[in-house]
Amino acid sequence: ALTCSDVSNKISPCLSYLKQGGEVPADCCAGVKGLND
């Protein structure tokens, strides 16, 4: 089961991408993939 802190830690690298666009950071991609584990 995921906790809220797990989710926020894993998606935090995505926030700047979501705000500004551009390339998806590798940390974001890895974090999102990690949510499925």
Curated annotation (Swiss-Prot):
The lineage of its organism: Eukaryota, Viridiplantae, Streptophyta, Embryophyta, Tracheophyta. Keywords: Allergen, Lipid-binding, Transport. It holds the Pfam family Tryp_alpha_amyl. GO terms for biological process: lipid transport. It comes from the Eukaryota. Transmembrane segments: none annotated. InterPro entries: Bifun_inhib/LTP/seed_sf, Bifunc_inhib/LTP/seed_store, Plant_nsLTP. It comes from Artemisia vulgaris (Mugwort). Plant non-specific lipid-transfer proteins transfer phospholipids as well as galactolipids across membranes. May play a role in wax or cutin deposition in the cell walls of expanding epidermal cells and certain secretory tissues. Belongs to the plant LTP family. One of its GO terms (molecular function) is lipid binding. This is Non-specific lipid-transfer protein.
